[in-house]
Amino acid sequence: MTVPQASVFQGITEEEWLQMGPACSMKWGLYEKGRTIFRQGEPAAEMGVVLSGGVCIESIDLWGDRSILSHVGAGQVFGETYALTGGPLPVAAVAAENSQILTINVSGLLKERYASSSWQRKLLGNLVYIFAQKNRALSARIFCTSAKTIRGRLLTYLSAQAVEAGSSAFSIPFDRQQLADYLNVDRSALSKELGRMRDEGLLEFHKNRFLLQRLPEGL
């Protein structure tokens, strides 16, 4: 198999990829939407690479309430922080759509015997960059959920998505329930607020496709 198009393997050559094979246990799997890849509470030993599709990182409390912390798209990784630090997973990784996932045993990749290898240095450098990107994504969610109203959370999130897309027309990686879980609001209340915002001419939407028309007064 050729080197997957993923951020964690940036700069890894075909030769280095072949050298990495014996260092860890790699497994490829197909996951239907809604299927759990890493279960909350289980020991963390592997990281996942999204080859196609997408994954939601979520937390479920003792009462069964779900919060989506982030979305991981194709070419991105998940679970690497917990695999490096060990212990039980405080979150779950669930397929957001039909997805192809590569799972890798992290401890094997970081063994001291490979310290002089070029691929390990590249891998560690890539992981540092990934950590920084994920810290930024976490900050973005904190900004969204700090707004006191559903409309405020929607505007913060959708505005950020528009900036990232470089256009007032864009797609988001969530369906309605996933968006509600990400913003930590009730789905029915979210749908009603979206309808009101559309009626007021603030935006248009169809499924996960949005068009921002104008900002409300005062913003």
Question: Where are the language model's segments positioned?
Answer:
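Cyclic nucleotide-binding regulatory module and flanking cytosolic helices
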Residues: 1-36, 82-84
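Cyclic-nucleotide recognition modules
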Residues: 24, 70-129
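Cyclic nucleotide-binding regulatory domains
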Residues: 35-97
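Short helix-to-loop capping/linker segments positioned immediately adjacent to catalytic or ligand/cofactor-binding
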Residues: 91, 111-120, 137-146, 164-167
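An amphipathic alpha-helical interaction segment
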Residues: 126-136, 153-160
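Phosphate-/nucleic-acid-contacting segments
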Residues: 150-153, 157-219
